[in-house]
Swiss-Prot record:
<dbReference type="InterPro" id="IPR014813">
    <property type="entry name" value="Gnl3_N_dom"/>
</dbReference>
<feature type="region of interest" description="Disordered">
    <location>
        <begin position="486"/>
        <end position="532"/>
    </location>
</feature>
<keyword id="KW-0175">Coiled coil</keyword>
<feature type="region of interest" description="Disordered">
    <location>
        <begin position="76"/>
        <end position="110"/>
    </location>
</feature>
<feature type="compositionally biased region" description="Basic residues">
    <location>
        <begin position="28"/>
        <end position="46"/>
    </location>
</feature>
<keyword id="KW-0539">Nucleus</keyword>
<feature type="compositionally biased region" description="Basic and acidic residues">
    <location>
        <begin position="521"/>
        <end position="532"/>
    </location>
</feature>
<dbReference type="GO" id="GO:0045664">
    <property type="term" value="P:regulation of neuron differentiation"/>
</dbReference>
<dbReference type="GO" id="GO:0003407">
    <property type="term" value="P:neural retina development"/>
</dbReference>
<dbReference type="Pfam" id="PF01926">
    <property type="entry name" value="MMR_HSR1"/>
</dbReference>
<dbReference type="InterPro" id="IPR023179">
    <property type="entry name" value="GTP-bd_ortho_bundle_sf"/>
</dbReference>
<dbReference type="Pfam" id="PF08701">
    <property type="entry name" value="GN3L_Grn1"/>
</dbReference>
<dbReference type="InterPro" id="IPR006073">
    <property type="entry name" value="GTP-bd"/>
</dbReference>
<feature type="compositionally biased region" description="Basic and acidic residues">
    <location>
        <begin position="76"/>
        <end position="88"/>
    </location>
</feature>
<dbReference type="GO" id="GO:0005525">
    <property type="term" value="F:GTP binding"/>
</dbReference>
<dbReference type="InterPro" id="IPR050755">
    <property type="entry name" value="TRAFAC_YlqF/YawG_RiboMat"/>
</dbReference>
<dbReference type="GO" id="GO:0005634">
    <property type="term" value="C:nucleus"/>
</dbReference>
Amino acid sequence: MKRPKLKKASKRLSCAKRYKIQKKVREHNRKLKKAAKKQGISRKAKKDIGVPNSAPFKEEVLREAEQRKQELETLKEQNKIVKQQEKAAKRKKEKDAASSVKEPAAKKAKKAAKIKEARAAIVKVKSAKTFKCQELNKVIEASDVIVEVLDARDPLGCRCPQLEEMVLKHEGKKKLLFILNKIDLVPKDNLEKWLHFLEAECPTFLFKSSMQLKDRTVQQKRQQRGTNAVLDHSRAASCFGKDFLLQTLNDLANKKEGETMLKVGVVGFPNVGKSSIINSLKEMRACNAGVQRGLTRCMQEVHITKKVKMIDSPGILAALSNPGSAMALRSLQVEEKEESPQEAVRNLLKQCNQQHVMLQYNVPDYRSSLEFLTTFAMKHGLLQKGGVADTELAATTFLNDWTGAKLSYYSRVPERQGLPSYLSDAIVTELQSDVDMDAVKKGNENVKRSVRFPNLASCISFDSSGPTAGVLDVSELPKEILTKAATTTDAEEEKMDTTTNTDEPEAESHISSTVEPIQEPTEKRKDKPAKEVKFVPVNTDLTSMQNKNNEDAYDFNTDFV
């Protein structure tokens, strides 16, 4: 009986009814067991009694049983693998049958993509160097004053005789200046010797670029000045040599005839600090600068003052005739994948004092560059899978230290053996007459007093290989690259022509093949046959089934409804 205001009926029964149900269930189960016993069906699994201890060959019997068990397991595993292979072969067969129509178009598209990538890579290698040469020549032509930036750690190796000769022999009588950058990475005595050596040939300015500049737009700078906000003096606090360099450039601009601005071209090898000097003078990040070499790829004009405009230039291309150590520091062969980092480190370590390198990097004695890189990688945690030292990454990190603005090393000043062939006493006096040398020397002294120099014992001694030859004309580029690029492009074009002529009917399929990778998943779903749903009739009448199997089965519906 259903109770009022309740959804479920009560489960309470009288004791007579409950006992009667239990009795009928017991009788029913007893009859089922009796029938199963007649048919020989037993629900309980027979217990393995094992091998008795009194058996004479117990160990052999157990061993044979274990062997049979393993054989059954291996057989089961083999059957499983065979089934998986059959399923995989069946799927592959269906996939091949479905994609057999599209295979010619897909092959042609893949081949065309490979040819396009190869051609783009060749054009990139060919055009990058020629473009840099053209941009460097544009900077020299457009500039009134050429500033050659030299790394104070190796000033002689940063000099390019071809560039200096081109500037001094130019028809426009351009002025040449030297800037010794990164002076905080060399000992003071070594810096003074280099300054004395360079001042005998050209006016030289000491400079330390700022490393704390942030990206700030002109609008933000105007708002800061207009609101009289507190200036962030720490942004250019680490820059030294800016004031007297700007004063010299302003004096040269005042001496210039006409009202045009003085254009100052900043040139030098990669990663000597050209863009950093311009950013320090501008007091904001106007040019892209960083540890990576070759970031500047085209000329860029930056207005410093109302009278001075500086032009940033890409790095000078180093000629292949230079020694290996010079190419490791002054060229972009490692970045352009023309030389391995390990080979560059090997050439570089030959020119270094081994004891100084061991003290600087805190590594034990090494017999080869590979041993040094392995120890260096282990010490800095540069490991591959399995704990193997990643020597390539270690070599790249080592090169970044040498070309960046952190590692302190110095090169010895050579004995003077006269002026270079493109310089004379008259040219030197003319270069020095354009600049107030007393003010320059005074400014250099102030910079030396302000900068904190490293100790000689904490620096690495480096043997410079002398001036680095540069490539300034496109015709002076290695002909192997240009001829190789030309032949490969011609060969690829001929290959493309032959493929297009032989497969003319497939022109439309080539166009559609570019879209095929996007449509491929949907096509796979279409090709896959849909599973047929089979409806099996099932008799849901429990009473009829039970009566059919056993007429004496208990029925709750008939007795208790």
